[in-house]
Design a protein with these regions (language model features):
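A residue-level signal for beta-strand positions that form part of recognition/binding surfaces
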Residues: 1, 54, 72
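Arg/Lys-rich, positively charged N-terminal/basic patches that mediate binding to nucleic acids
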Residues: 1-29
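A short, surface-exposed loop/turn module that caps and links secondary-structure elements
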Residues: 30-56
Length: 89
């Protein structure tokens, strides 16, 4: 199952995340959920000392930050590359 933070929904409603980009990420997460193969996409583990293992998924200039818990995907931030890493921490 894919879970999105409320902040992502707010950003989408404000127009900060284009519908096309949100659809690209959602389709990628659906494919990940079905295949469980992270090598199909441009996904990298985020380095650092965090409580969880965070990953980033890249689609053009946009990034999605997420973690996996019991085969569920929790997307915590979607944004442009320049700002995404500063805002989610």
């Amino acid at each position: 199952m894919i879970h999105y933070e409320k902040s992502i929904q707010k950003s989408y409603k404000k127009g900060e995340i284009p519908k096309r980009i949100l659809r690209l990420f959602h389709n990628a997460f659906l494919s990940l959920e079905l295949t469980k193969d992270m090598n199909l996409f441009d996904i990298k583990k985020i380095k650092g000392n965090y409580k969880r293992e965070y990953y980033r998924l890249r689609k053009g200039k946009y990034r999605a930050i997420f973690y996996i818990l019991k085969n569920d995907f929790y997307v915590i931030h979607i944004g442009k590359r320049e700002e995404v890493y500063d805002k989610w921490q």
